[in-house]
Amino acid sequence: MEEQKKRTAREIIENYDGPAVRIMEVCGTHTHEIFRLGIRKLLPKQVELISGPGCPVCVTPVSFIDEAIYLALEKQVTICTFGDLVRVPGSQMSLAGAREKGAKIHIVYSPADAEKYAKEHPKEQVVFLSVGFETTTPAGCLSVKKAREDGLSNYSLLVANKTMPQAYQALKGSADVFLYPGHVNAITGTALLSLIHISEPTR
């Protein structure tokens, strides 16, 4: 029965004879799974699947990287960051390049790790680079709350968080269909979707 469902779904896709349609996903997990499962290869030629800016690191502005490097090199601040941000280029260099020049760049796996590092190194000013959409922002906020509870004065965030409605507004006209990340709704609720007004796509 399950195999029959799979065949039926594939037949529907392969026999699609409707109008051309552009579908955009804006979630890094969607991007990964579409690639892993080879979904693009299954789609007919008139269905175009586009990867949008689902990775917050990929859409982090150069100015943010420059500011982090300035804090690290000029103000001797310890930068705590996720590993995938280290090689993102600024206007002059990346965080990896700054580390080669003596900057303290500490890789963490969560904002909680950054707060813990600040607690264990009270003589260092520690700045966590907070990038991400609605799903990761609360963890950064929680780390600030924890730092206050721990009485820390050496922990802060450099923020470049983004929200999905604004991302969609910037992308309006780029696709006919958008795949919305369900885990964002788990944080914001579905009412946030009412803020999104997508215009007719341009051809």
Residue ranges and their predicted role:
Residues M1-K123, T137, L158, Y168:
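Metallocofactor- and cofactor-centric catalytic cores in central/energy metabolism, strongly enriched
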Residues A68, S143, I198:
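Aromatic/hydrophobic pocket-lining residues that form π-stacking "cages" and hydrophobic walls in ligand
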Residues Q76-T81, L85-R87, P181-S194:
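Extended, charge-rich low-complexity interaction segments
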Residues L129, F133-L192:
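Phosphate/pyrophosphate-binding betaalpha-module
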Residues S194-T202:
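Residue-level detector of conserved catalytic or cofactor/ligand-binding positions
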